[in-house]
Design a protein with these regions (language model features):
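Short helix-capping/linker turns of helical repeat alpha-solenoids
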Residues: 18-23, 36-39, 52-54, 59, ...
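Hydrophobic face of amphipathic alpha-helices that form TPR/SEL1-like repeat modules
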Residues: 11-18, 33-34, 45-52, 83-85
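Terminal, low-structured helical/coil segments at or just beyond the last alpha-helical repeat
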Residues: 78-112
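The canonical alpha-helical register within tetratricopeptide repeats
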Residues: 33, 62, 69, 84, ...
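Sec/Tat signal peptide C-region and signal peptidase I cleavage site
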Residues: 3-9
């Protein structure tokens, strides 16, 4: 188990360097396989890109969707940020984000 976590950490770092340099497209490319493997940290980072509109169009619904998924995968940061984000969303948008999260999980995080 620790070996897998180490590999995930190294792969996650491959996305963090370009992200911190403002190269969001490369960061997203590096994180996508991890997101699809259920890596909570990568899912959380993807949520932040939607929240901030970094490399993607800013979208609170998709940010909330990925925060839901990351929280379910074990990210405490995602749980905290989700509680903050809902204050900026309508009940309809929250419901849509929850529906999208359920569908994404059913598809094993592919094409979400």
């Amino acid at each position: 188990m620790a070996c897998g976590a180490t590999v995930w950490s190294v792969d996650l770092d491959k996305g963090l360097a370009p992200y911190n340099a403002g190269d969001f497209a490369t960061a997203l490319t590096e994180w996508k396989p991890l997101v699809e493997q259920g890596n909570a940290a990568a899912q959380y980072n993807l949520a932040l890109t939607y929240d901030e509109g970094e490399g993607v169009i800013q979208d609170n619904v998709y940010a909330h969707m990925w925060l839901n998924i990351a929280a379910a995968s074990g990210s405490e940061q995602a749980r905290s940020n989700k509680d903050i984000l809902v204050k900026q969303m309508t009940p309809q948008d929250i419901s849509k984000a929850q529906d999208l999260a359920r569908e994404c999980v059913k598809k094993n995080y592919k094409d979400c």
